[in-house]
């Protein structure tokens, strides 16, 4: 009992600076908000009231291994990207903690795989219900650690929870097969069995949804997981762990090992090379994905990867301009351009080019508002860090130096070092960085083209192929282009394509496998053929 109280006290001390207006003090059974004025500068205190009522149980700073909250030997700071201020100190796990988490997950797997599909389904449903009950607090955590506008954070929490709901239902639909063989005295059976422990490595841009999309499928299949969240956004993963525990998910089934950027490489290598891990699921950059593939190759592990993209957004002459602009706004500026399926280059046919650029610029000026994610009306929050801002800035400067024209935006925003103005460029050519390097920011470069063949050639020149979009009112053209685009997902007259019911993934160097949909659970299942003779 003394140990438990000490752990809670450690958590309280660490969270004393966590989230403005939500200072915590220990008490038996958990953490409660402390009284007194909100700490920190006025820039942070301006939204302190929105966090003051946050559930203390969801503000976790330790690792979650084997059903227990465990501190690490060191901690690392998590920063608010809007102000740069430290939100709190989180356990900085290393190789030792990573291996302990894998061991806990393996021991739990030996029990979890025997749990009936109906019971697994019920537990995932309880987890989903708890997410819905706590959706406001979970959304505020996302906004605090990622800068995402609160309205979008609420949307992510619902999207995230829906994966648990979906896979709670899919858990009961894992069917095998019977194959008739030429021999009359034999029967062939095909069983689907859970693959084992899955190492799950997730990004910062969707700190909740990228976890449940993977973990929901894994747990539904009968696998257990070790989650290494992005160092920028560990609080969401830890809050999910608390709710998983409350839902009755057995100890060791869901484990979380946060770590700093300094430790990320060795922790990632430790869990991906551990012989007790059978599966690796990763969302992140193509460069990191290739490193993890190398780790997986040494022991031939199953791998799912959702990597970088360079999504083309094509507007043909037959397109409805207003519809295309609405799709462009949704596709490009969600999460301030920091999504893997954001349109990266806009290919606009000559006949409609000027009308589209004019309408797009007007829509940007009218509808986009840069600000702190907690401020009502904000549509564009900060980028995750200054390095991300520098990348956008570099691409804009490169394009302008080579002849591109800034229609609107084009520079850092006065709000702070992590803010950049929503930017529209025209007169863009294919020799510019922004056309062959993923931006991950609020930059929309427009390339003028003449023929359908030219647009397809530009779009397919990339060595990645996650998503693509195009707008056309020509039925024959729609079929041709949809089939010819070398991407895993296509939006036809639609800028928002993600859905829990549909398979998410790419081709070429954008990844392996699919997540979500009825196909997502197959990534965590092995096929076993059983030949039954002597009948």
From Swiss-Prot:
It catalyses: succinate semialdehyde + NAD(+) + H2O = succinate + NADH + 2 H(+). The modification Phosphoserine is found at residue 499. Disulfide bonds join 340-342. Brain, pancreas, heart, liver, skeletal muscle and kidney. Lower in placenta. The keyword Protein transport does not apply. One of its GO terms (molecular function) is succinate-semialdehyde dehydrogenase (NAD+) activity. The record marks 205 as: Transition state stabilizer. Changing residue 334 to A: Reduces catalytic activity to less than 15% of wild-type. GO terms for cellular component: mitochondrial matrix; mitochondrion; synapse. Its main location: mitochondrion. It is found in: Mitochondrion. Redox-regulated. Inhibited under oxydizing conditions. Inhibited by hydrogen peroxide H(2)O(2). NAD(+) binds at residues 202-204, 228-231, 284-289, 306, 438-440. The modification N6-acetyllysine is found at residues 126, 265, 365, 411. Belongs to the aldehyde dehydrogenase family. It is linked to Succinic semialdehyde dehydrogenase deficiency: A rare inborn error of 4-aminobutyric acid (GABA) metabolism, which leads to accumulation of 4-hydroxybutyric acid in physiologic fluids of patients. The disease is clinically characterized by developmental delay, hypotonia, intellectual disability, ataxia, seizures, hyperkinetic behavior, aggression, and sleep disturbances. This is Succinate-semialdehyde dehydrogenase, mitochondrial. The lineage of its organism: Eukaryota, Metazoa, Chordata, Craniata, Vertebrata. The gene is ALDH5A1.
């Amino acid at each position: 009992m003394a140990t438990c109280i000490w752990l809670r006290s450690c958590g309280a001390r660490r969270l004393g600076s966590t989230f403005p207006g939500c200072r915590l003090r220990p008490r038996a059974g958990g953490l409660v908000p402390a009284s007194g004025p909100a700490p920190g500068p006025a820039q942070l205190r301006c939204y302190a009231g929105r966090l003051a009522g946050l559930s203390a149980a969801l503000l976790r700073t330790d690792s979650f291994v084997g059903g227990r909250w465990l501190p690490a030997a060191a901690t690392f700071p998590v920063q608010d990207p809007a102000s740069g201020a430290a939100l709190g100190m989180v356990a900085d796990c290393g190789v030792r903690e990573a291996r302990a988490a894998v061991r806990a997950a393996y021991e739990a797997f030996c029990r979890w795989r025997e749990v009936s599909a109906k019971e697994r389904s019920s537990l995932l449903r309880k987890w989903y219900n708890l997410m819905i009950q706590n959706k406001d607090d979970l959304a505020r955590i996302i906004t605090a650690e990622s800068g995402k506008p609160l309205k979008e954070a609420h949307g992510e929490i619902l999207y995230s929870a829906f994966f648990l709901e979906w896979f709670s239902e899919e858990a009961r639909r894992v069917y095998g097969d019977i194959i008739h063989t030429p021999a009359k005295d034999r029967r062939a059976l095909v069983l689907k069995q859970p693959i084992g422990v899955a190492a799950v490595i997730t990004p910062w841009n969707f700190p909740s949804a990228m976890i449940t999309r993977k973990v929901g499928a894994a747990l539904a299949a009968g696998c257990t997981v070790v989650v290494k969240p992005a160092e920028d956004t560990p609080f969401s993963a830890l809050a999910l762990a608390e709710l998983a525990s409350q839902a009755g998910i057995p100890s060791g089934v869901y484990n979380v090992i946060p770590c700093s950027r300094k430790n990320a490489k060795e922790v990632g290598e430790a869990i991906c090379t551990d012989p007790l891990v059978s599966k690796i699921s990763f969302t992140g950059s193509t460069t990191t994905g290739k490193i993890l593939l190398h780790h997986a190759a040494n022991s031939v592990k199953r791998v799912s990867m959702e990597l970088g993209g360079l999504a083309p957004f094509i507007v043909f002459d037959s397109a409805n301009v207003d519809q295309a602009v609405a799709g462009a706004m949704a596709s490009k500026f969600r999460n301030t351009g920091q999504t893997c399926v954001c349109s990266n280059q806009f290919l606009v046919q000559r006949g409609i080019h000027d009308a589209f650029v004019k309408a797009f610029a007007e829509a940007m000026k009218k509808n986009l508002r840069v600000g702190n994610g907690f401020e009502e009306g904000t549509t564009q929050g900060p980028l995750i860090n200054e390095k991300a801002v520098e990348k956008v800035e570099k691409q804009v400067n490169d394009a302008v130096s080579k002849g591109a024209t800034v229609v609107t935006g084009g520079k850092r925003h006065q709000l702070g070092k992590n803010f950049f103005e929503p930017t529209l460029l025209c007169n863009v050519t294919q020799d510019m960085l922004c056309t062959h390097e993923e931006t991950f920011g609020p930059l929309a470069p427009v390339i003028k083209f003449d023929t359908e063949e030219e647009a397809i050639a530009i779009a397919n020149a990339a060595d990645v192929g996650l998503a693509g979009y195009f707008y056309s009112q020509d039925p024959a053209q729609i079929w041709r282009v949809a089939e010819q685009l070398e991407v895993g997902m296509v939006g036809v007259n639609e800028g928002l394509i993600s859905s829990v019911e549909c398979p998410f993934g790419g081709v070429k160097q954008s990844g392996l496998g699919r997540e979500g949909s009825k196909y997502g659970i197959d990534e965590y299942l092995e096929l076993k053929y059983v030949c039954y003779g002597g009948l």
